[in-house]
């Protein structure tokens, strides 16, 4: 018989895979209660509210039916955890008291409809408020010493586009090749803290952008160690890191006429055992959040989706590290 007590390491697995059955609903309720307690919402949202207030845009929700920004951001979190479309989220908020409690709504309060959720997503994507949200939360993690900054591990993942290449519906997606296979879509780039596995930085691009092009924007150049796979191998890059006193843990790359030495292979194996930690956020996004491909047809909204998944992953790390 399964216990109702949540194993915090698997908290999001329990919540995201709840299938809306009665037993797991109890775990989901507990999961949402823990999230509510762990985050300083006022501090998180203040800079975002200031940006929205200062920005005068034709597509702003102002003047239409509006909701507290806290409710909207929590709606985005629910969508990421439970893999819900806008219409399905509206239905579940109306049906599930645990969702209403998480959002701070009474049973008599109006709930955000699918149009409202969509409008706010457009606002966040157009103003890059998803990035602001992510980095404001990371400030809280830094204050808690969960972003240590001694070591950084960099990697990227390919996300298949929602549109087919032949449809020409997605103007931002593009092609790339990996291990001889062609992909059409985007890339999500991350840098994690090597000690806590918290995602420190995020970038999002079309798939044609080489992983290494995002390298400089993902590192701080104040860390002691940087690790990355051989796709980032570049002699000038290695020299730059070493000149700053940073240990270069970029895996060596072999070439057709210059294979790796035994020493280099051994070094790669040792570095890989540490570097592999960067695969865990991507695995979490795919296996737990069911984020296996893009949902939208442009880079702004697909970036928003990726960064929200990274944000939820960091919430999960906060809970795991503080329990």
Question: Could you describe each region identified by the protein language model?
Answer:
Residues 300-302, 307-323:
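Charge-patterned, long linear interaction tracts outside catalytic cores
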Residues 1-46, 321:
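Charged, often Cys/His-bearing segments associated with DNA-binding zinc-finger transcription factors
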Residues 224-225, 230-300:
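Helix-centered, glycine/charged polyanion-binding patches within enzymatic domains
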Residues 61-70, 180, 297-304:
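Structural motif
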Residues 32-77, 81:
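Basic, short loop/linker segments at the boundary and entry of helix-turn-helix/winged-helix-like folds
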Residues 97-107:
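Short, basic interhelical loop/turn and adjoining N-cap
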Residues 87, 91-94, 104, 112-247, ...:
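Polybasic low-complexity intrinsically disordered regions
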């Amino acid at each position: 018989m399964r216990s109702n007590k949540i194993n915090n390491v698997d908290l999001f697995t329990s919540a995201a895979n709840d299938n809306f059955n009665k037993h797991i609903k109890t775990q989901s309720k507990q999961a949402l209660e823990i999230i509510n307690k762990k985050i300083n919402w006022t501090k998180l949202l203040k800079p975002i509210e200031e940006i929205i207030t200062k920005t005068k845009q034709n597509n702003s929700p102002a003047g239409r039916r509006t909701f507290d920004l806290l409710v909207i951001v929590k709606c985005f979190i629910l969508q990421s955890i439970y893999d819900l479309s806008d219409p399905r989220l509206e239905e579940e908020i109306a049906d599930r008291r645990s969702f209403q409690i998480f959002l701070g709504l009474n049973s008599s309060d109006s709930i955000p409809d699918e149009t409202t959720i969509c409008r706010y997503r457009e606002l966040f994507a157009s103003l890059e408020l998803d990035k602001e949200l992510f980095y404001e939360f990371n400030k809280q993690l830094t204050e808690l010493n969960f972003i240590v900054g001694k070591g950084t591990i960099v990697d990227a993942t390919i996300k298949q586009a929602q549109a087919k290449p032949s449809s020409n519906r997605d103007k931002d997606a593009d092609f790339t090749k990996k291990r001889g296979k062609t992909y059409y879509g985007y890339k999500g780039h991350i840098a994690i803290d090597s000690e806590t596995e918290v995602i420190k930085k995020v970038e999002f691009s079309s798939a044609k952008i080489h992983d290494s092009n995002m390298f400089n924007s993902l590192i701080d150049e104040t860390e002691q160690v940087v690790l990355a796979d051989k796709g980032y191998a570049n002699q000038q890059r290695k020299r730059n890191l070493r000149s700053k006193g940073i240990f270069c843990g970029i895996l060596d790359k072999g070439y057709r006429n210059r294979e790796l030495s035994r020493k280099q292979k051994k070094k790669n194996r040792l570095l890989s055992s540490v570097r592999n930690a960067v695969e865990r956020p991507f695995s979490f996004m795919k296996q737990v959040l069911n984020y296996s491909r893009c949902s939208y047809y442009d880079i702004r909204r697909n970036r928003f989706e990726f960064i929200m998944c990274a944000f939820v992953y960091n919430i999960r790390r906060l809970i795991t590290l503080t329990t």
